[in-house]
């Protein structure tokens, strides 16, 4: 990733710290992956404090595929089977079956309904019967070990919310341009300026986590 493009958002460690503070304060962040990987930017919000307005923003400026990133432990708590037995997607993106809140939604498509579904899935005492299947929210299961094991947006969402001291669950959606094409670094940076969202890379988060591990050891 071209570090010059991101310099206005601080050093790599500052970018992570800014992202954590943003999530704690109920704001979103923008996460870029490697140029040799998907080369895309995702909006990420903490599931715990996401608002209807933020969900509407996500739907309006994103791909429309709103994903809820969960730990394996939470996936098992909700008894969510994986979408397929054999994952042949290029980056092994770990989709489960889609979900809908069993109560409190109409068609499940609106910003309010999707947020109701997310809140049902992350509440402390959530159980499988709280959710109907299929639905309009796409859960993703993060790899244990996070970005140190898999450098994906799913793992970044769970790592960031965990490091922020929030529930380990994030809502993400790929950012798209007005013409429907995928947004890359220059467009993501411009989007961050417009919507007051810090930008960081998965590479930043990997380095940050490794530094924390060195401090502990």
Curated annotation (Swiss-Prot):
Record EC number: 4.1.99.12
Cofactor-binding details, from the entry: Binds 2 divalent metal cations per subunit. Magnesium or manganese.
GO cellular component: cytosol
Superkingdom of the organism of origin: Bacteria
Sites marked Essential for catalytic activity: 136, 174
Pathway: Cofactor biosynthesis; riboflavin biosynthesis; 2-hydroxy-3-oxobutyl phosphate from D-ribulose 5-phosphate: step 1/1
Residues that, per the record, bind D-ribulose 5-phosphate: 37-38, 42, 150-154, 174
Binding residues for Mg(2+) 1: 38
Keywords recorded for this protein, A-Z: Lyase, Magnesium, Manganese, Metal-binding, Riboflavin biosynthesis
Cofactor(s) it depends on: Mg(2+); Mn(2+)
One Pfam family cited in the UniProt record for this chain: DHBP_synthase
Amino acids binding Mg(2+) 2: 38, 153
Single GO BP term: riboflavin biosynthetic process
Disulfide linkage: none
Catalytic activity: D-ribulose 5-phosphate = (2S)-2-hydroxy-3-oxobutyl phosphate + formate + H(+)
PANTHER family per record: 3,4-DIHYDROXY-2-BUTANONE 4-PHOSPHATE SYNTHASE, GTP CYCLOHYDROLASE II-RELATED
Subunit structure: Homodimer.
Full protein name: 3,4-dihydroxy-2-butanone 4-phosphate synthase
Organism in which the protein naturally occurs: Sodalis glossinidius (strain morsitans)
